[in-house]
Swiss-Prot record:
Subunit structure: Homodimer.
An annotated GO cellular component: cytoplasm
A Pfam family that the UniProt record links to this protein: tRNA-synt_1b
Stated family: Belongs to the class-I aminoacyl-tRNA synthetase family.
Single GO MF descriptor: ATP binding
Alphabetical GO biological process terms: tryptophanyl-tRNA aminoacylation
Entry keyword Mitochondrion: no
Catalysed reactions, as listed in the record: tRNA(Trp) + L-tryptophan + ATP = L-tryptophyl-tRNA(Trp) + AMP + diphosphate + H(+)
Keyword Protein biosynthesis: yes
This protein's name: Tryptophan--tRNA ligase
């Protein structure tokens, strides 16, 4: 029997089984009340964009949505929309799991040439973590550079620190705050008597960018699309609940599954555990050592048993990483089917994972080296619009 805990601050599947139990995303869809993403939506997106759908859509990594069909209607009718996502800076460098929503945003921005706002929740990390405010802000600035290195268009992208720039939409923060009573906040976010009042007030800040009126440079009435990890859904569910009272359009959202940490598919990768995460500044040999030593395998106890029964693909972390970072569908299928049949061993799966992750991180690091303070200023400058 497994129990899932999915909140913006805690993701884990607790089970009495010896083998880690993967997160049940169908259960999340039912629990959160969102809709399952389907191939028809991916096909329509592809038709409207004129570009092949990102493999995140094809592989079920984008697994759920809220009103994405209505967002596609907006696109079909040439009505404006924009993207919104965020990052909570808990470490100086992001890990590979943090890149997933941003890679999705990059695809959408490239496909539709649309504006993107990225919220850096340095205030949230200060309020929830044992962290100095100065450190949270410093991590935020470094994380902005990490994000810039992914290749966004500076003319279409605004990245902002909540501490430094949320005053630009303070009016909406106040309006949203007034619509949420304490009982509702406790129910949605799990606050209790130990929660500080800063934590209780924070959700209004994450909700505010869902509404185009928070940004003067975005057209009035533009619909917001939020690509995000599913653990952030409580914020956007509440945003949709309050939209009518605020006279705003409900935001649409698409949710990606959570990249597991190295030690098991039952929890997401966390920056707080260096042995369970692969950071974007990890050296090539460090990546190799982490995957070989720590990546949980679905292989059998002996090679003979593995050849006979095949590997357990559902709990194999190296294969999960291939799903996210190997863009060749045919090669991915070769490793999936070969592993299930026992033709590909756990060692071979890990070796392939090492190569793919090393290549991704190496390309990223070359881009990150080129990011300057001037680049950072170009992305955080609200006056450019």
């Amino acid at each position: 029997m497994a129990e899932q805990r999915i909140t913006p601050w805690d993701v884990e599947v607790v089970s009495t089984d010896e083998v880690p139990v993967a997160i049940d995303y169908d259960k999340i869809i039912n629990q959160f009340g969102c809709e399952k993403f389907n191939q028809a939506l991916a096909d329509r997106l592809e038709k409207l964009s004129g570009k092949p759908a990102h493999y995140f859509f094809r592989r079920g990594i984008v697994f759920a949505h809220r009103d994405f069909n209505l967002l596609l209607d907006e696109i079909a009718n040439n009505r404006p929309f924009y993207l919104y996502t965020g990052r909570g800076p808990s470490s100086k460098t992001m890990h590979i799991g943090h890149t997933i929503p941003f890679l999705l945003c990059k695809y959408m921005q490239d496909a539709f040439k649309i504006r993107l706002v990225i919220q850096i929740t340095d205030d949230e990390k200060f309020l929830w973590k044992s962290m100095r405010l100065e450190d949270a802000m410093a991590y935020g600035r470094e994380n902005i550079k990490d994000i810039v290195a992914l290749g966004f268009d500076p003319k279409l992208t605004y990245i902002f620190s909540n501490v430094e720039a949320s005053h630009h939409f303070e009016e909406n923060i106040l309006k949203i705050s007034k619509t949420i009573n304490l009982n509702e906040a406790i129910k949605v976010f799990g606050f209790d008597m130990s929660s500080n009042i800063g934590q209780v007030g924070f959700p209004a800040k994450e909700i505010a960018p869902c509404f185009s009126s928070s940004f003067r440079f975005i057209g009035k009435g533009a619909m917001c699309l939020v690509p995000a990890a599913v653990d952030q859904d409580p914020f956007f569910r509440l945003a949709r609940d309050k939209a009518k009272a605020l006279g705003e359009k409900k935001p649409s959202s698409i949710y990606v599954s959570l990249l597991p940490d190295l030690k098991g598919v039952n929890r997401k990768m966390s920056a707080s555990d260096p042995n369970s995460s692969i950071y974007l500044d990890d050296a090539q040999d460090t990546i190799r050592k982490k995957i070989i030593a720590y990546a949980y395998s679905g292989g059998r106890k002996t090679l003979e048993e593995h050849r006979e029964k095949g590997g357990d693909i559902d709990v194999d972390v190296p294969f999960e990483y291939l799903k996210y970072f190997l863009d060749d569908d045919q090669e991915l299928e070769k490793y999936r089917s070969g592993y299930i049949k026992g033709e590909i061993t756990s060692k071979e799966m890990k070796e392939k994972c090492v190569v793919v992750i090393q290549e991704f991180v190496s390309r990223y690091q070359e881009s990150r080296k080129r990011v300057t303070d001037d680049d950072l200023r170009a992305f955080i400058d609200i006056n450019k619009f």
